[in-house]
From Swiss-Prot:
EC number, as in UniProt: 2.3.3.13
A GO term for molecular function: 2-isopropylmalate synthase activity
Pyruvate carboxyltransferase domain boundaries: 5-267
Designated name of the protein: 2-isopropylmalate synthase
Localization per record: Cytoplasm
Gene that specifies this protein: leuA
Lineage: Bacteria, Pseudomonadati, Pseudomonadota, Gammaproteobacteria, Enterobacterales
């Protein structure tokens, strides 16, 4: 009987570190729901002590996720662990993941400590975390460059302290597969209490070996793999979970292990992460790339037509990739749209049908036919806009040409008021943005602008993803329309609403801090009076 490999997803923690702008709580929650639907066993959703925003997102996800274990990351620091426990305690099941560096280089130059002191600190912090939950994971940061005897000492002590999962990271993507497999095998050989914990691995792709190292570790006995969807992450990225999952499924004959992943959800989840994180998937990306199941060579095409297994070791259907269909028009009713969403695997609570159908009719009037990917894009945008927004784009008009300066007129709905302005700019998009800045009074500067075609042909939707700077902080915005200038305007309006929301959060945090300070002062005065 094959053993299970636990899939530990860190897209919302390690993966998010690669993004130019942080995701909103709503965006993180949408990804978390998709990961839960895909069947990940554990999802690491943030670093709660790092910021009030991260604390809020971890707590929100912990409150809403029911079928996956929610995890928060901490350093081996008391405050980190206490704050993580506070954020996670609303979850039905949660894990605290704490780490400390173990390589000689990190201990000497970063921690300015000794191995004995590191072990002592790890033991204390693991026990502290165990006060909050039985599910504690401990990571030996830079384990790939830690001498095996030292690593064995740390792992044995961590297990004795109560860690149920021991994670072995190749933090800088340095090791080769045979080396990394040997590290895992050595732990099984030399750590006497190794049977009391699950051995996990966390690999990075600096040398393009993250998946290879993870598979070598699984072959050597590791039973948890950490990674991200599409391999997103710092520097060259993390281990691509979709590749690990399909490698385990495809090469069961060699590995004799399995996962509890719903493989039919892989492609959809991958696309969702790509869209929300504004990180396009390379066409030649294994498993989920546009060319992963494409055959252009005549010999290959002939072989596939005769028997797909000649050149396909897995099928598009095995990851939930279905053929694009041309079956929805402006004459299609709500029931048809709902049925198509069900066929694509969406549940009723994944999207707002009223908003989706309204947006669908507008698009269908423009395009005539609406594709599956159009429908998903509209559902995604509708999901983002479910909460009332302060700013709405009411109207815009642009005049531009090769011999005239671009001029834009924009009308925004700002709460209960409507305001209009006109401005010139370096092109139609810049003119629109200058007019919007005049209306709001925000001096928002564009940092990154990316246009992606969603669909095919002249009627394709244009998705504009932007990163904008406001008072030293970066905000992400997305817009979707058949008109590029319109989608650009929508993206900036999305940024404005994110800025407005961030300001409201800051005010609420200040109010809570003032309230807490007042309570502390009142308590001190009361204690002083009692003493007198």
């Amino acid at each position: 009987m094959s053993e299970q490999v636990i899939i530990f997803d860190t897209t919302l923690r390690d993966g998010e570190q690669a993004l130019q702008a942080s995701l909103s709580v709503k965006e993180k929650l949408q990804i978390a729901f998709a990961l839960e639907r895909m069947g990940v066993d554990v999802m690491e959703v943030g670093f709660p002590v790092s910021s009030p925003g991260d604390f809020e997102s971890v707590q929100t996800i912990a409150r809403n996720i029911k079928n996956s274990r929610v995890c928060g990351l901490t350093r081996c620091v008391e405050k980190d662990i206490d704050v993580a426990a506070e954020a996670l305690r609303v979850a039905e099941a949660f894990r605290i993941h704490t780490f400390i560096a173990t390589s000689p280089m990190h201990i000497a130059t970063k921690l300015r400590s000794t191995l004995d002191e590191v072990i002592e600190r790890a033991i204390y912090m693991i026990k502290r975390a165990r006060n909050y939950t039985d599910d504690v994971e401990f990571s030996c940061e830079d384990a790939g460059r830690t001498p095996i005897p030292d690593l064995c000492r740390v792992v044995e002590a961590a297990i004795n302290a109560g860690a149920r999962t021991i994670n072995i990271p190749d933090t800088v993507g340095y090791t080769m597969p045979h080396e990394f497999g040997n590290i895992i095998a050595s732990l099984y050989q030399h750590v006497p209490n190794i049977d009391k914990a699950i051995i996990s691995v966390h690999t990075h792709d600096d040398l393009g070996l993250a998946v290879g190292n993870a598979m070598a570790a699984v072959h050597a006995g590791a039973r948890q793999v950490e990674g991200t969807l599409n391999g997103i992450g710092e520097r060259a990225g993390n281990c691509s979970l979709e590749e690990v999952i399909m490698a385990i499924k495809t090469r069961h004959d060699i590995l004799n292990v399995h996962t509890n992943i719903n493989h039919q959800e892989i492609y959809r989840t991958s696309q969702l992460v790509s869209q929300i994180c504004n990180m396009p998937i390379p066409a030649n990306k294994a498993v989920v790339g546009a060319n992963a199941f494409a055959h252009s060579s005549g010999i290959h095409q002939d072989g596939v037509l005769k028997n797909r297994e000649n050149y396909e070791i897995m099928t598009p259907e095995s990851i939930g990739l279905k053929e694009v269909q041309l079956n929805l028009t402006s004459r299609s009713g709500r029931a048809a749209v709902k049925h198509r969403m069900e066929e694509m695997g969406y549940q009723d609570n994944d999207y707002n049908l009223d908003d989706l159908y309204s947006a669908f009719l507008k698009l269908a009037d423009k395009k005539g036919q609406v594709f599956d990917y159009d429908l998903e894009a509209l559902a995604f945008i509708s999901r983002q806009q479910e909460e009332p927004e302060f700013y709405h784009l009411d109207y815009f008009s642009v005049q531009s040409g090769s011999s005239v300066m671009a001029t834009a007129s924009v009308k925004l709905i700002c709460g209960e008021e409507t305001q209009s302005e006109a401005a010139t700019g370096n092109g139609p998009v810049d003119a629109v943005y200058q007019a919007i800045n005049r209306i709001t009074g925000y001096q928002v500067s564009l940092v990154k602008y990316q246009l992606t075609a969603k669909g095919q042909g002249r009627d394709a939707l244009g998705q504009v993803d932007i990163v904008a700077d406001y008072q030293g902080r970066r905000f992400h915005g997305v817009g979707l329309a058949t008109d590029i200038v319109e989608s650009s305007a929508q993206a900036m309006v999305n940024v404005l609403n994110n800025i407005k929301r961030a300001q409201q959060v800051e005010k609420e945090i200040q109010r809570l801090q003032q309230h807490n300070n007042q309570q502390q002062n009142d308590s001190k005065q009361q204690n002083s009076q009692e003493t007198v």
